[in-house]
Amino acid sequence: MVLTSKQKEELNGSILDYFESSQYKSSFEEFKKETGTELDVKKKGLLEKKWTSVIRLQKKVLDLEAKVAQLEEELNSGGGRGGGRGRGKEDALPRPPEKHILTGHRNCINSVKFHPSFSLMVSASEDATIKVWDFESGEFERTLKGHTNAVQDIDFDKTGNLLASCSADLTIKLWDFQTYDCVKTLHGHDHNVSCVRFTPSGDQLISSSRDKTIKVWEAATGYCIKTLVGHEDWVRKITVSEDGSCIASCSNDQTIKTWNIVKGECLATYREHSHVVECLAFSTANIIDIPGSLLSTPEGKSKVKQGPGGNLVGQCGYLATGSRDKTIKIWELATGRCLATYIGHDNWVRAVRFHPCGKFLLSVGDDKTIRVWDIAQGRCIKTINEAHTHFISCLDFCLHNPHIATGGVDDVIKVWKLQ
């Protein structure tokens, strides 16, 4: 590339200024003599400015190239159903960049949860606090204080008027979300309480703990009405089926169990993971038929009562589980079979959620990625790399507004718009 006379003059002037400002006296005099260039105050710092501009432009080019590569991957990953083409609002997926980055917690984020009706969300942190945010504006609303140790999990009842939280301080707290007052503190677990979930009716609350038990509480009174025993180690997470009849739990003992809430009995135990099972989620009612599933045929649907635990667990459909073995497994509850194993995460899988449209599963993990899995194809169709600067610990869907939220060990929450 040949420089014009004006460009040469500008370059020589900026180099001369650089020699002078860096006190390279001999180089300054020699260069000035050879080029016949004089110092010009207008060119003060010009070389440094151009250099930093080039670096910024290089970074932008690299970012754009990465985005183009990701979009090309989406377009080539299977067309309308699983790929980037033909997707409507109901099956929109998260796309970078994030809409908001919410900062304020002083330690890692353990749980995020959207309010069922309003444009509010809550976050629970190792800093022993719960924070309330407006996820549309990205504004911080308030902090709920009461726990004396890390807040491990949070959940709303169906009305959004009651918030439950659980903590490493061995307690569960119920908060009136209209006044933000703590109205009840539940005692009963003997170790870190790691997960809490309301049943769909809101009448009962389910909790799991490092004490190896699951407890069922009466929300109105705060009384423990059942204790479910069966796991041999820390019960990490629990999830409740859409009809409220069945719960599933996962544990450090590398197993998943399903339970009859009414009878307090274990219905079935699932073993295929080779490490701690960190997370799990029941499928949505509108999930697509999974290839090889008993439920994918009319005849099979009539036979669900023959599965482990009988008709009750069979009616719950499918269960997704994520593990420290870096895999996600899809289980057919009617037969107890593992239908699919998703491989792609490079570290622990920390949270899984079925997309409300029933076609996709989303996951996050310690590899700092958000991944989208096409259930019909049984493969990852989208990856958001470096979604956080540290491990991603939690994920939630907003069911009334197309957003997801993620929380990480980097102490921040990110809100992502689905599009």
Curated annotation (Swiss-Prot):
Among SUPFAM superfamilies, the record links this protein to:
Lissencephaly-1 protein (Lis-1, PAF-AH alpha) N-terminal domain (SSF109925), WD40 repeat-like (SSF50978)
Q: Where, if anywhere, are coiled coils annotated?
A: 52-79
Q: Does the keyword Cytoplasm apply?
A: yes
Q: What is its main location?
A: cytoplasm
The biased composition feature labelled Basic and acidic residues covers 87-100
Residue segments, region Disordered: 74-100
What SMART domains does UniProt report for this protein, alphabetically? LisH, WD40
Start and stop residues of the WD repeats:
104-145, 147-187, 188-227, 230-271, 272-341, 344-385, 387-419
Compartments where found: Cytoplasm, Cytoskeleton; Cytoplasm, Cytoskeleton, Microtubule organizing center, Centrosome; Cytoplasm, Cytoskeleton, Spindle
Print the keywords alphabetically. Cell cycle, Cell division, Coiled coil, Cytoplasm, Cytoskeleton, Differentiation, Microtubule, Mitosis, Repeat, Transport, WD repeat
InterPro entries found in the cross-reference section = Dynein_regulator_LIS1, G-protein_beta_WD-40_rep, LIS1_N, LisH, PAC1-like_LisH-like_dom, WD40/YVTN_repeat-like_dom_sf, WD40_repeat_CS, WD40_repeat_dom_sf
User: Is Coiled coil found in the keyword set?
Assistant: yes
An example GO CC term for this entry is:
centrosome
Q: What are the BP-aspect GO terms?
A: adenylate cyclase-activating G protein-coupled cAMP receptor signaling pathway; cell differentiation; cell division; centrosome localization; establishment of mitotic spindle orientation; Golgi localization; microtubule sliding; phagocytosis
* Any Pfam family the entry gives: WD40
Question: A Gene Ontology molecular-function term?
Answer: small GTPase binding
| Top-rank taxon | Eukaryota
Domain LisH as annotated: residue spans? 7-39
Q: What is known of its domains?
A: Dimerization mediated by the LisH domain may be required to activate dynein.
Q: Which family does it belong to?
A: Belongs to the WD repeat LIS1/nudF family.
Question: Its quaternary structure?
Answer: Interacts with dynein and mtaA/CP224 in the cortical attachment of microtubules. Interacts with rac1A.
What role does it play?
Positively regulates the activity of the minus-end directed microtubule motor protein dynein. May enhance dynein-mediated microtubule sliding by targeting dynein to the microtubule plus end. Required for several dynein- and microtubule-dependent processes such as the maintenance of Golgi integrity, the coupling of the nucleus and centrosome and dynein/dynactin-mediated interactions of microtubule tips with the cell cortex.
The UniProt entry, under HAMAP family, shows:
lis1
- Protein name as it appears in the record: Lissencephaly-1 homolog
Q: Which organism is it from?
A: Dictyostelium discoideum
